């Protein structure tokens, strides 16, 4: 993550950063909610979300349609049928300190108006570390069970839910005709340890932690597997109810108990921040002895009428907040440091540890974040260890399970350091493809520059290459890319972009099983795939540049370069000429080509350095050569036809359902006539083109007095009627 403070970001940098954060947070949402295998801690995830929110607060007109601030969870997994929740399953805001809790309580009082101190009751309940579930009953009979999914649509796991003994299949007489009980499916620590002992005895790989195991168990296609896992449930909330049997949160908890649902015995009704914090600390002291994982305490306004008055923000209720626990710690020996290469080329140091139990989980690896963290330097250049020491192999280290997910080393027991311990030297070369690794100014992370050739990044790079705004090859989605990348037959393999364009020829020459005879394909779909590939042998220059996956060269910057250089030959020539003659240097500021690169509108030194790094790496140039040999030709950008255009230099927003063109076609047309496009309406907007169904953007335009026209008027305006 970049170190540039939010208040110092320029608008182009903010656009780039919001694009990166949207992509990165979506990736981690997918890992956590859909795949049950998170790769970063809760704290690191929360930091990404907070940075995204801070940038959006400073640049509200840059909020993306795919912004993490507008999304809950992730889309449901395709192997299960989808269930639309009658009432959305929203996430909660987080508190990380006593002050955060006091601020939350204060905000409730301020919103509700003048009230006596401590007059509002709150419930406080342990935050179970499991999988959120909504269970629907109609006329007392269990009808469906669904995961939270993206908050609006979840996965139908009804068959598996029925195997959980603690969830009643039938409600007692007198229950409302429609009831949705919400709660958390989890696995007890004792059952988790027993399962791992069984797996080890059978010579199978053991599981990482109870939360992931519970989530994976619930998503089994075979309900017998789910039944064997001894899953449990705590009820704590509700969705649709045809009639409310209580008027307080605590009253509903008691109703759940009467209906036969387990409710957490540590739930209490309290008043004021002091009582909430005292209960939080009491639960924290009991945490290690509990037979289930918890990662905090949830506070809710008790009276339901006050909950209704307080209402909701876009993704979370105003009447509730989750107070997170700090991570648990233990001491062990650092045996080694390995370097892993992530899907985006980031080099991450990983500590290999003498096995140690932290919070009930055996830990053998821990993240070391980056070079600076090993040296004891924080994100803002501050020293993060009191006596300014680094981390060395052989050290006795303090390990923390941050967010109960990814362990990290937080400190060193310096008195136990051996006399011959030496500082760790961070590599400047990718351990996977041996391309040079660079660390951009203002960043803490080294990144491999062999993006198109590095095996660690290959699948992600190919997915990006064929994505909608790049080569847009229909029939090459995520699953197909995974299939071709891992294919054992060389005539089917797609390891680099050039392989896409030689696939048909290689298949024609193959004596082995043909693609159309492989399950999941067929003659028709294979023909469509080949046609889609061949249709992209000639590709618009900006799409080609975006498809290369050069760091910081997103869709917007790719268009800027295309408009500035007009041909790929001119762009490549400038990039190669800007490569410094001295190995190890990243820029040659006296170089004319370098000055030309940074002079492109909206392009600064950070983006230009990324371009130069890409072209300085011989492996990338080799991949490009192979791409051209395979018959790919970037089509020269047409110079803007906007001379005298009435929209030249204006900012245009398209909204509603366009009937004569797609949204992408509309944006391309506007840019062709010299206009800029935006995704939201602000004071900087000059024109709004509204189709049927235009909503909030149309209202905002009217409020700001911005000109609004329909689609037909747009075509007339630009002279294409």
UniProtKB/Swiss-Prot annotation:
The keyword Cell wall biogenesis/degradation does not apply. Its cofactor is Mg(2+); Mn(2+). Residues 642-721 form the BRCT domain. InterPro entries: BRCT_dom, BRCT_dom_sf, DisA/LigA_HHH, DNA_ligase, DNA_ligase_AS, DNA_ligase_CS, DNAligase_adenylation, DNAligase_N. It is an enzyme of class 6 (ligase). NAD(+) binds at residues 42-46, 91-92, 125, 148, 184, 300, 324. Its EC number is 6.5.1.2. It holds the Pfam family DNA_ligase_aden. GO terms for biological process: DNA repair; DNA replication. The active site is at residue 127. Disulfide bonds: none annotated. It comes from the Bacteria. Keywords: DNA damage, DNA repair, DNA replication, Ligase, Magnesium, Manganese, Metal-binding, NAD, Zinc. Zn(2+) binds at residues 430, 433, 448, 454. One of its GO terms (molecular function) is DNA binding. It catalyses: NAD(+) + (deoxyribonucleotide)n-3'-hydroxyl + 5'-phospho-(deoxyribonucleotide)m = (deoxyribonucleotide)n+m + AMP + beta-nicotinamide D-nucleotide. The keyword Cell inner membrane does not apply. GO terms for cellular component: cytosol. Belongs to the NAD-dependent DNA ligase family. LigA subfamily. DNA ligase that catalyzes the formation of phosphodiester linkages between 5'-phosphoryl and 3'-hydroxyl groups in double-stranded DNA using NAD as a coenzyme and as the energy source for the reaction. It is essential for DNA replication and repair of damaged DNA. This is DNA ligase.
């Amino acid at each position: 993550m970049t170190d540039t403070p939010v208040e110092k970001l320029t608008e182009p940098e903010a656009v780039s950063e919001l694009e990166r954060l949207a992509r990165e947070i979506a990736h981690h949402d997918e890992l956590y909610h859909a795949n049950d295998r998170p790769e970063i801690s809760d704290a690191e995830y929360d930091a990404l979300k907070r940075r995204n929110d801070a940038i959006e607060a400073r640049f509200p007109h840059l909020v993306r349609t795919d912004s993490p601030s507008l999304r809950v969870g992730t889309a449901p997994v395709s192997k299960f049928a989808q269930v639309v929740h009658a009432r959305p399953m929203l996430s909660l805001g987080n508190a990380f300190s006593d002050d955060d809790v006091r601020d939350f309580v204060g905000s409730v009082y301020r919103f509700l108006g003048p009230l006596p101190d401590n007059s509002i009751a709150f419930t406080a309940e342990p935050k179970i570390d499991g999988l959120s579930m909504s269970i629907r009953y109609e006329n007392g009979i269990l009808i469906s069970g669904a995961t939270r999914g993206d908050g609006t649509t979840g996965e139908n796991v009804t068959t598996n839910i029925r195997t959980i003994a603690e969830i009643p299949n039938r409600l007692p007489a007198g229950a409302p005709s429609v009831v949705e009980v919400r709660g958390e499916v989890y696995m007890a620590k004792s059952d988790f340890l027993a399962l791992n002992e069984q797996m080890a005895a059978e010579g199978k790989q053991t599981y990482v932690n109870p939360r992931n195991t519970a989530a994976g168990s619930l998503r089994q296609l075979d309900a017998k597997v789910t039944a064997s896992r001894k899953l449990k449930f705590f009820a704590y909330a509700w969705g649709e109810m045809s009639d409310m049997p209580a008027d307080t949160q605590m009253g509903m908890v008691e109703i759940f108990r009467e209906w036969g649902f387990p409710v957490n015995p540590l739930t209490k009704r309290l008043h004021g921040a002091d009582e909430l914090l005292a209960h939080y600390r009491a639960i924290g002291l009991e945490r290690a002895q509990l037979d289930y994982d918890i990662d905090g305490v949830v506070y809710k306004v008790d009276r339901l009428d006050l909950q209704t008055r307080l209402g909701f923000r876009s993704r979370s209720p105003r009447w509730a907040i989750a107070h997170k626990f700090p991570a648990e710690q233990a001491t062990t020996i650092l045996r080694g440091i390995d370097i892993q290469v992530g899907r985006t080329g980031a080099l991450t140091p990983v500590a290999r540890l003498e096995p140690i139990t932290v919070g009930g989980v055996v830990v053998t690896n821990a993240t070391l974040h980056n070079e600076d963290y090993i040296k004891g330097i924080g994100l803002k250049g501050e020293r993060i260890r009191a006596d300014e020491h680094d981390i060395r192999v052989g050290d006795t280290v303090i390990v923390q399970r941050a967010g109960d997910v990814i362990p990290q080393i937080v400190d060193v027991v310096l008195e136990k350091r051996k006399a011959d311990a030496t500082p760790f030297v961070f590599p400047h070369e990718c351990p996977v493809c041996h391309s040079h690794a660079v660390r951009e100014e203002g960043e803490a992370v080294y990144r491999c520059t062999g993006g198109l050739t590095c095996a660690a990044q290959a699948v992600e790079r190919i997915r990006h290459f064929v994505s909608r705004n790049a080569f847009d090859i229909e029939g090459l989605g995520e699953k197909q890319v995974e299939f071709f990348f891992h294919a054992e037959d060389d005539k089917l393999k797609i390891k680099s972009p050039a392989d896409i364009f030689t696939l048909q020829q290689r298949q024609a020459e193959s004596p082995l099983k043909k693609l159309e005879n492989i399950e999941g394909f067929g003659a028709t779909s294979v023909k469509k795939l080949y046609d889609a590939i061949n249709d992209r042998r000639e590709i618009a220059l900006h799409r080609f540049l975006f498809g290369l996956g050069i760091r910081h060269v997103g869709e917007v910057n790719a268009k800027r370069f295309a408009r500035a250089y007009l041909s790929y030959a001119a762009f490549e020539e400038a990039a190669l000429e800007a490569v410094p003659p001295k190995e190890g240097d990243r820029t040659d500021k006296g170089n004319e080509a370098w000055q030309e690169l940074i002079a492109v509108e909206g392009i600064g030194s950070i983006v230009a350095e990324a371009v130069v790094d890409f072209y300085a790496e011989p492996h990338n140039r080799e991949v490009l050569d192979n791409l051209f040999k395979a018959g790919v030709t970037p089509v020269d950008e047409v110079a803007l036809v906007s001379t005298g255009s009435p929209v030249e230099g204006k900012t245009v927003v398209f909204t509603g359902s366009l009937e004569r063109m797609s949204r992408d076609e509309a944006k391309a047309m506007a840019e062709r006539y010299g206009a800029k496009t935006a995704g939201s309406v602000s004071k900087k907007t000059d024109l709004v083109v509204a189709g049927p169904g235009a909503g909030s953007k149309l209202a905002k335009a009217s409020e700001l007095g911005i000109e609004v026209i329909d689609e037909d008027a747009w075509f007339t305006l630009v002279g294409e009627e």
